[in-house]
Structures are given as structure tokens and as C-alpha cells.
A protein has these predicted regions:
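Bacterial N-terminal signal peptides that target proteins for export
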Residues: 1-7
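N-terminal cleavable signal peptides for secretion/export
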Residues: 18-62
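Short hydrophobic/aromatic-rich beta-strand segments that constitute the beta-sheet cores
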Residues: 67-71, 89-94, 102, 174-179, ...
Length: 240
């Protein structure tokens, strides 16, 4: 099965260094989802998501104030999805015959190409939930990060009730995400392993591991790897 995905996964990584320095959690998250710098990448970001031996090509694009991703088991009949940035409803839409249709609650949590990533994960829609709370600073992989808690608004669909996000204090890129259920059980963890510079003071994801967990035992069930290539204009610089 050969699949191609246009997704917004790395969009919240892109930010200016100054935005991440503010100790206000709303400002930190706003900086983490800034997209203006993505317009500097005319061809977007290309890479892949891989689970086991199956690899799915991925490409990230920004269309004005909309982030879009495309998934298709058949390259000739792609399915296109989008979310408008700053939309307080946090809804994802599928474009069918030129018209936007809401994704159902079940579709939001459906896996993409058999991986640990869902449509909810690809859009990182929880970054748009209101009233984030700063819980302090912690190191992630030896890197100083702000730890932010985001609670799901009432009557909002999705698996996660509480999401914790660790944002790099210097680069402004998120370094780790943990999604929990209503009982506090860990459902999924996103662990960034490397970032890269794509423009002046703009950093984005190079490599990340996404792991699904058993919320009762905390045991890791399965893993998906996400990797992006360096743009031609980028001068990559890893964390380690």
C-alpha cells in the first residue's frame, strides 16, 4: 500500500525564538503554532511516517490560514483534510467535491495508514484548546523546556482529556507531548528526538517517535517513527 499524506503535524513546531521565552503559557503555545515562517518553504517539508516495515511518504503545506493534509491509499483519488488556524471550534474538515464536511468524532481518532497517528494527532488540534496552564520547567532529553497543561473543553470530541506539552525554552519547538484519559491514564506520547533549523530563528521537527500506551498499566503497546528531510535552504543542527 503506497500512501501519501499532506499533514499539519509539524506546524506547531515552527516558531520564533522570542515567542518561546515568554513565561505566559498562552504566548508559548501561540508561538509554537505560528505558521508565517512556513511560507518561506515554497515546496513544504517532505518526510515519512513508519510503523514496522510500512513507510508512508508525508509532505507538509500551509495554504493561507489553513493547514492541510492529504491521505490516499490510491494516489489517483486522494482524500484532502484541512483545519483553519485560530478556529475556536478546533474542527477538522474533509474536502469532498469542493465542499468541506466535518469529520465525525469516530473519524478523528481513526489511525492513519495503520500507524499510531490519528487525524486528531496529525492536526495537533489540542494546541488550540483555551486556557493553557504553565506548570513549571523540566528537562526533556537534557533540554530545558516549559511544561504546559491543556484541558479539553466541555463537549469537545477526541480521546484526550488532558494534554501536557513540553516546549523548548530556547528554540520554541515542542519536545514532548503526553495525552491522558479522564482517569489520568497515559494514552499516547510524542517524543521529539531531533529538530532542525529551516530559517533564521525558525526550528522544526526532524525526527519524532510516537508511542501508544495501555492507560491501565502504562505499558507501551506500539511505536511509529516520524521523520522529515532538511529543506534545501536549511542548515540542519541537531540537539545532540
Amino acid at each position: 500500500m503506497h500512501c501519501r499524506v499532506l499533514l499539519a503535524l509539524t506546524l506547531p513546531f515552527l516558531c520564533l525564538n522570542a515567542m518561546a521565552q515568554a513565561p505566559d503559557p498562552a504566548a508559548i503555545l501561540e508561538g509554537a503554532r505560528l505558521s508565517a515562517s512556513l511560507t518561506k518553504l515554497e515546496k513544504g517539508l517532505t518526510g515519512s511516517i513508519r510503523k514496522g516495515n510500512h513507510k508512508t511518504p508525508v509532505t507538509l503545506f500551509l495554504m493561507g490560514r489553513e493547514i492541510q493534509f492529504q491521505f490516499s491509499e490510491n494516489p489517483n483519488t486522494p482524500r484532502i483534510f484541512h483545519m483553519r488556524m485560530g478556529d475556536s471550534s478546533y474542527n477538522l474538515f474533509e474536502i469532498i467535491d469542493g465542499k468541506s464536511r466535518d469529520l465525525s468524532a469516530n473519524q478523528l481518532v481513526a489511525p492513519i495508514a495503520g500507524t499510531d497517528l490519528t487525524y486528531e494527532d496529525l492536526s495537533l488540534r489540542f494546541f488550540y484548546w483555551p486556557n493553557p496552564k504553565l506548570e513549571g520547567s523540566e528537562d526533556v532529553g537534557g533540554q530545558p523546556c516549559y511544561k504546559i497543561r491543556i484541558d479539553k473543553p466541555h463537549n469537545t470530541p477526541g480521546r484526550y482529556e488532558v494534554v501536557y506539552v513540553w516546549v523548548h525554552e530556547k528554540f520554541g519547538a515542542f519536545m514532548k507531548i503526553r495525552g491522558h484519559n479522564s482517569k489520568g491514564g497515559l494514552l499516547k506520547e510524542f517524543q521529539v528526538e531531533d529538530i532542525m533549523q529551516v530559517a533564521d530563528k525558525v526550528w522544526t521537527l526532524r525526527k519524532m517517535q510516537v508511542a501508544s500506551h495501555d492507560p491501565e498499566s502504562g505499558r507501551r503497546i506500539s511505536i511509529t517513527d516520524v521523520t522529515f528531510d532538511s529543506p534545501n535552504q536549511a542548515k540542519p543542527r541537531g540537539l545532540r
